[in-house]
């Protein structure tokens, strides 16, 4: 499939927050249209959908992929791109129009959480090359690799995310799910046996949580 080099592939993630967040998509779309942005957009439809759509866009030749969503959607998108068959993954620009509850990536990079400046930033082709981290692990007997842009949590942090995702089905709101996860773990002090190697240093022991971040100075 041949795609114009300047055309955006936009993935809108409607589940990234509340009804107010979903409503803002119409305003974002109208603003992109008013700016003459050439784009195709697709809407995610459930768990794993953003990753699958990002992979399809990368395979179909889109070299600017824009996520309208939060940190979770952004993480799924980078995995879709990295797991795609595109030969020039390093030339794919991943943009973000913050539209979720958690926008840590945008805040860290000083990106506006307002959609108009975010769209303008992408239009002006303001690019920065950053690292992509990855984590190899086993899910049962199956070896897997996941990529990340912000951080990867092992132990307590990962447990909180897992419980949040599970309880979100019942609470419906991510914030309440997060509070429920914290409450359920408040009396739990589970330690994990780990062996960490950081450069030439080895750390062995029972550890509650580890957070590995990509930081820039």
Where do the protein language model's features map onto the residues?
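ATP/NTP phosphate-donor binding region
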Residues: 1-68, 79
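Short, glycine/acidic-enriched loop or turn micro-motifs at the edges of active sites
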Residues: 16, 74, 101
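Catalytic core of DAGKc-family lipid kinases
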Residues: 35, 83-212
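Short alpha-helical
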Residues: 48-49, 72, 155
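Short Gly/Thr/Asp-enriched flexible loops that form oxyanion-binding sites at enzyme active sites
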Residues: 73-86
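Conserved small/polar residues in nucleotide/adenosyl-binding loops
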Residues: 216-217
């Amino acid at each position: 499939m041949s795609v114009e080099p300047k055309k955006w592939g936009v993935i809108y993630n409607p589940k990234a927050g509340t009804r107010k967040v979903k409503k803002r998509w119409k305003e974002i779309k109208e603003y992109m249209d008013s700016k003459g942005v050439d784009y195709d957009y697709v809407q995610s439809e459930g768990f794993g959908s953003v990753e699958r759509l990002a992979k399809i866009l990368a395979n179909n030749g889109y070299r600017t992929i824009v996520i309208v969503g939060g940190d979770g959607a952004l993480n799924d998108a980078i995995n879709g791109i990295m797991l795609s068959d595109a030969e020039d993954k390093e030339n794919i620009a991943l943009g973000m129009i913050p539209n979720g509850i958690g926008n840590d990536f945008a805040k860290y990079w000083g990106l506006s959480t307002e959609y108009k400046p975010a769209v303008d930033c992408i239009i002006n082709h303001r690019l920065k090359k950053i690292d992509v981290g990855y984590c190899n692990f086993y899910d049962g007997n199956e070896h897997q690799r996941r990529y990340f842009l912000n951080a990867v949590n092992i132990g307590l942090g990962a447990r909180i995310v897992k419980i949040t995702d599970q309880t979100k089905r019942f609470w419906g709101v991510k914030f309440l799910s997060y509070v429920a996860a914290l409450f359920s773990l408040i009396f739990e002090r589970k330690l994990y046996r780990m062996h960490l190697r950081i450069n030439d240093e080895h750390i062995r022991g029972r550890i509650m949580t580890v957070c590995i971040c990509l930081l820039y100075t």
